[in-house]
Every structure is written in C-alpha cells, then in structure tokens.
Amino acid sequence: MKIVESILNRSEEVVYRELQSIASDNNMKVFAKPRLSDVIQKDNTFLTQREFDFYTRSHCDFVVTDDGFRPVMIIEFDGPLHQSDEKQQERDQIKNELCKRAELGMLRINDRHVTKLYRGMTVLRWIVEVTELEKAFNEAQENGQIPWDEGCEAAASRS
C-alpha cells in the first residue's frame, strides 16, 4: 500500500482552486471529498436500502460552507463518465434526490464552468455569487431591511 499522489485529479484540482478563491472572497469555506453523511444528517426520512447504502458510502466532490461551517451547497464535478455510464447516472440521481430532501443546493459542473468567462468571471464564480446575493436579498427582506414588494417593483418596471 502507498499514499496516493493527490486526492484530487487535475480537473478537480482546478475546480478546488477556483472554489477556494470564490470562498475566500465570500467569507465561506470549501471542503474536498467529505462523506455525504457528514454533510446531510439523516432524520426519520425513509430511505430505501439502496439509498441508505449510497448515503453511508458516498462522498461529495466539494462542499461549500458558511463561516460557521454550515453546508451552503454541494458542488459535483461531472466528467465524461457522468454522461455515458448508466450506473453513474443512477448514483447521480440518488445524490440529487438526497440533497433535494435535505434542501441543500447542489450544482453539477464540468470543466467549462471553470474555463469559460461570463462578465469577466468564471461561470462557476458567477453562479455561486448570484446564489449568495439572492440569499442575502431574501434575508434582508425577511429582516425588514428591504420591502417585500421591492423584487416585484423591479420586475414590473422592466416589463
């Protein structure tokens, strides 16, 4: 037995570095390869045997947390195998469903999300930052800092 050269392949390493940069700019943290059961806590929710086995044995590619280490979203890097392998697609569906039940956002990306630019930033950065802006906006509305009709007025004025 020997130690692996790296726990991340080259593509995952590129994603990790981009996520680290995004996280540092947004007061968040990034973790690579945590177990799904460390990110999503099982409650009384019924899981089939297949779902339970998957839940206890699988990992996430990346988890983004807030500064208090609470998971904000899972980022899955999908290489070509995810498009062509039926078994992999089944596993992806189970993970998607478990995240949905836990109300934890999941973003499935490929290499274009870290190589293509949109408005001067990677598509991955744009998606994460827009997601965080939406959360901050909704929080501000809930706290009474932004009127509830603010979002509606802006949309109506553009029509």
Features from the language model and the residues they span:
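Short secondary-structure junctions
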Residues: 22-30
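A short, structure-level motif marking secondary-structure boundaries and short turns
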Residues: 1-4, 79-82, 130
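Basic, amphipathic alpha-helical patches used to engage nucleic acids or provide basic targeting signals
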Residues: 60-63, 68-121
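Alpha-helical scaffold elements within enzyme catalytic domains, especially in hydrolases
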Residues: 21-22, 98
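Nuclease catalytic cores
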Residues: 1-16, 20
